């Protein structure tokens, strides 16, 4: 492996500007790494070599002319395969979209290409972003770079594994209930979900529109901050996009956090926590105290309801959003239907995987006449209570911390026959999506088997700069982020 691939995006940018390496060389080195690793890792559904090298050549031309480079120009990136890139397959890891070629770019893709960021390929995911282990892909499972027998987390497992294994330096994922933060935790990297509306969802294949948010993966907090800056901003094509100026998130990374009020979420520090994760949390609390922060315990009384709320609201929205995949306009169509109704039924039965079908049925039930008030409406009311818990908590503290997950990565197949156990993996992450607040997972140590542990940090809406500052100070107080998977 080219040693430069192990470096951060900030270090790679410096090497490009100093002409120590060309963007084409860096991109080709990343493709070589992918060809070495990906048969056993399974992180990519497809590669976009021509697009990536074309972008890299533009970077080299700018350098040759002595022109300034846009932020992150020339840095290899993977795009989760539920975001559109014109002319490439966008499958959402589903048979129903197996041969769908995108006719337009997602807004985040446009922003990346505008900043000359080479997009090397489309990263594997749980089908339609539904899952916590990346075992639900219709094509292949993703393996954890730290131990190939274990899951990388989901649903953005391919994005996380590609960054963790140094196939690419950066990646984009989407987070509906923890789908960026959980794989970041399991793969020992940084993963961040912005405030809802901070990043445009235009061109993202929808799962649950009121919860979905695109965010960055990186190996350092600084790189994640810069990637969020590139993809943020108002988009008239997305009605939920916030009309706010883009911040320079990396500007406050090194601000002193003396006196920062840190709240430890009481409900996420009790039963179910593995001994290794509990020890890592204790160490993280001590680290913040040494940095001058004041640490207190905070209770979020309605947090215990968050999984129930989420699996009513998310499945209801999924049932509605996925109705468009019916075999009429695009995607897979069953070859042997005798009439229109049979074509709908067979196409969806053959095209969707078991987890997607389970969620469509759950959501359709929650929205059906007679159950709407009992389930969907009540879940919306409870969502407001969870959000209010955060509002009250942030009156007392500046940030909240918890484990990203009560446990480290589990073995492939260990939970696939028990959906409820799989759903509980997201116990710590779901509430941030319900409340629309920004959250991040940063490396916080390793368990007895050498598997990464993640610390989750949450901040009030639109306080991404505070989040990055608190995360960066913790990151630099340790060397966890410097340790790479030995794959």
Regions found by a protein language model. Give the residues of each.
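Flexible, acidic loop-helix segments that line cofactor/substrate-binding pockets
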Residues: 42, 238-246, 260-261, 265-267, ...
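General small-molecule cofactor/ligand-binding pocket signal
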Residues: 120, 294-299, 440
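Short alpha-helical scaffolding segments that buttress acidic/His motifs in well-ordered protein cores
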Residues: 26-30, 309-310, 356-364
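Residue-level signal for inorganic ion chemistry
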Residues: 30, 52, 105, 224, ...
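Gly/Ser-rich catalytic/binding loops embedded in alpha/beta enzyme cores
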Residues: 2-176, 283-286, 290-291, 387
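Serine-dependent amide/ester hydrolase catalytic core
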Residues: 13-14, 124, 303, 326-434, ...
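Structural helix-boundary/capping segments
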Residues: 36, 165-171, 176-271, 278, ...
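Short helix-loop capping/hinge segments that flank enzyme active sites or metal/cofactor-binding pockets
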Residues: 72-92, 251, 256-265, 316-387, ...
């Amino acid at each position: 492996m080219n040693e430069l691939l192990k470096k951060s995006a900030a270090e790679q940018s410096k090497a490009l500007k100093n002409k120590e390496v060309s963007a084409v060389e860096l991109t080709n080195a990343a493709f070589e790494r992918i060809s070495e690793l990906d048969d056993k890792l399974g992180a990519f559904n497809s590669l976009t070599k021509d697009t990536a090298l074309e972008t890299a050549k533009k970077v080299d031309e700018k350098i040759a002319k002595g022109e300034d480079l846009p932020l992150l120009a020339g840095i290899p990136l993977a795009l989760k395969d539920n975001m559109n890139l014109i002319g490439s397959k966008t499958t959402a890891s589903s048979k129903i979209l197996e041969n769908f070629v995108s006719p337009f770019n997602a807004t985040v893709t446009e922003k990346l290409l505008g900043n000359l960021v080479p997009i090397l390929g489309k990263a594997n995911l749980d089908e339609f972003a539904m899952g916590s282990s990346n075992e639900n892909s219709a094509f292949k499972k993703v393996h954890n770079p730290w131990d190939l027998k274990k899951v990388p987390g989901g649903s953005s497992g391919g994005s996380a594994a590609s960054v963790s294994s140094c196939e690419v330096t950066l990646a984009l994922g989407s987070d509906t209930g923890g789908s960026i933060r959980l794989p970041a935790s399991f793969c020992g990297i940084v993963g961040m979900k912005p405030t809802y509306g901070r990043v445009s969802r235009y061109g993202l294949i929808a799962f649950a529109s009121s919860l979905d948010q695109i965010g960055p993966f990186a190996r350092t907090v600084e790189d994640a901050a810069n990637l969020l800056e590139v993809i943020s901003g108002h988009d008239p094509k997305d009605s939920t996009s916030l009309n706010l100026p883009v911040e320079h998130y990396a500007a406050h990374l090194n601000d002193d956090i003396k006196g920062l009020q840190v709240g430890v979420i009481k409900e996420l520090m009790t039963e179910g926590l593995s001994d290794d994760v509990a020890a890592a949390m204790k160490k993280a609390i001590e680290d913040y105290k040494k940095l001058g922060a004041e640490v207190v315990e905070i209770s979020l009384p309605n947090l215990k309801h968050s999984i129930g709320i989420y699996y009513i609201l998310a499945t209801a929205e999924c049932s509605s959003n996925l109705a468009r995949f019916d075999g009429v306009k695009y995607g897979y169509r069953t070859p042997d239907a005798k009439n229109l109704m049979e074509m709908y039924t067979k196409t969806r039965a053959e095209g969707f995987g078991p987890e997607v079908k389970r969620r469509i049925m759950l959501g359709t039930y929650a929205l059906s006449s007679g159950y709407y008030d009992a389930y969907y409406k009540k879940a919306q009311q409870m969502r407001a209570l969870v959000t209010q818990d955060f509002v009250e908590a942030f009156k007392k503290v500046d940030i909240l911390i918890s484990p990203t997950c009560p446990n480290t990565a589990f073995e492939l197949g260990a939970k696939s026959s028990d959906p409820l156990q799989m759903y509980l993996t997201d116990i710590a992450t779901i509430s941030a999506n319900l409340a629309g607040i920004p959250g991040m997972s940063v490396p916080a140590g390793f368990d007895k088997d050498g598997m990464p542990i993640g610390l989750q940090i949450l901040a009030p809406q639109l306080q991404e700069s505070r989040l990055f500052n608190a995360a960066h100070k913790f990151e630099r107080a340790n060397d966890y982020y410097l340790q790479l998977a030995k794959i």
